[in-house]
């Protein structure tokens, strides 16, 4: 795996381990992360603080990480009690830290497929 991809994978692995200090070393001080589904933006240490404050009972699985130079994409599954969330995250990594990112979150099974697509599904 590339160095930049390893930074993102390691960040999520440290989050899963609740190694908050270790995870924080992988985030740039001027970090900004955007959540598209809510329009929220987290700057600096607020991103890690928000994750740390999230109610316990969750687990993270890094499904896939793809890197092309400083750009890294990650598919991550988060299970919290009986709900599964998916994150498709796209990050910029420089000098061994995540500098920015956009995360697209969905809740598995939370939406019914539209009727018009039924003829195309198996």
Listing of model-derived features with the role each one plays in the protein:
Residues 1-122:
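C-terminal and inter-domain tail/linker signature
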